[in-house]
Amino acid sequence: MSIGENIRRLREQRKMTQEQAAEKLGVSFQAVSSWERDEYKPDTDKLIRLAEVFDVSVSAIVEEKSNRFKTKETIYNWEHMRTYVKTTAKNFKMKNTLKAVDYAIEAHEGQKRKRSNVPYIYHPLNLACHALAMDINEDEIIAACLLHDVVEDCGRTLEELPVNDETRELVRLMTFVEEKGEDRESALQRYYEGLAGNPKAALIKCLDRCNNLTTMSWGLSRKRIYRMITETDKYYPELLQVVKDTPEYNSAAWLLKYQIESTVDIYKRLM
């Protein structure tokens, strides 16, 4: 693709008009139009500004790639995952999970994953299926996987959740809250210390990070991706060790460590 085609593609991906892009760049929309038609090329200063506005590297604008890989927003159908979780929950008599599935679907109704048309419920269902695929079928863990974002993102309270106290406690630990007067780093330190004190919560958080790492390339800005990488490097070795030191989760720890660290390493090489 030419520079002009790259500019147009990046602009359209961010749902900007030429006028909106021009305003952010400090140029006329005619200038943006001429770049996209390849009549003129932006100078170096404008290329740098374009990269900032689109939150990409300069090379993403100037590189001419004749072939682009087709990518997927999802791998599995969320309704199929729901059926799998429900069927498994019935077979293992997982009462909390059966209640949590429908509650989570209703709570997240209408929500989408960042910068996509993927229903948000895909994310908690992914965590539940990931755990079940590793032969983790503890009722409270699967239920908490499904409900882990409803307090933080849906305005629900712990008391409203249709599950037992242990599941509510896992959801509480998974819910990130910045207390009044607390800076983000202090809040994160307190949050991860709480997770590390509970092996089940540590396991769920590692499942959560696995899914978020695999989707952040299209859901987050480069700045947020960098923050996600540094946060993972800082806090997840301890969580993974907690999971590994819990005999019933030892095998799962190997898989989680491999997925988290290999995915982070790929991003580091490409950033």
Give the role of each language-model region:
Residues 5-24:
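Short basic helix-loop element that most often maps to the first helix and adjoining turn
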Residues 17, 28-31, 43, 57:
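Short coil turns linking two alpha-helices in DNA-binding domains
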Residues 25-41, 63-66:
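Recognition helix of helix-turn-helix/homeodomain-like DNA-binding domains
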Residues 26, 45-60:
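DNA major-groove recognition helix of helix-turn-helix/homeodomain DNA-binding modules
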Residues 70-271:
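Active-site helical microenvironments for divalent-metal-assisted chemistry
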